[in-house]
Amino acid sequence: FLAKKVAKTVAKQAAKQGAKYIANKQTE
């Protein structure tokens, strides 16, 4: 089902953003 694929993609992007956010927090 398409929704599952979209959810997976969104989760992947969220993980990427989260990692970036954490990295930024640690470098402060």
Swiss-Prot record:
Tissue: Expressed by the venom gland.
Predominant subcellular localization, coarse grouping: secreted
Keywords: Amidation, Secreted, Toxin
Record-linked Pfam families: Cu
Location of this chain's protein in the cell: Secreted
Glutamic acid 1-amide, modified sites: E28
BP terms from Gene Ontology: defense response to bacterium
GO terms for cellular component: extracellular region
GO molecular function (one): toxin activity
Family as reported in the entry's similarity comment: Belongs to the cationic peptide 04 (cupiennin) family. 01 subfamily.
The protein's name in its UniProt record: Short cationic peptide-1c
Lineage: Eukaryota, Metazoa, Ecdysozoa, Arthropoda, Chelicerata
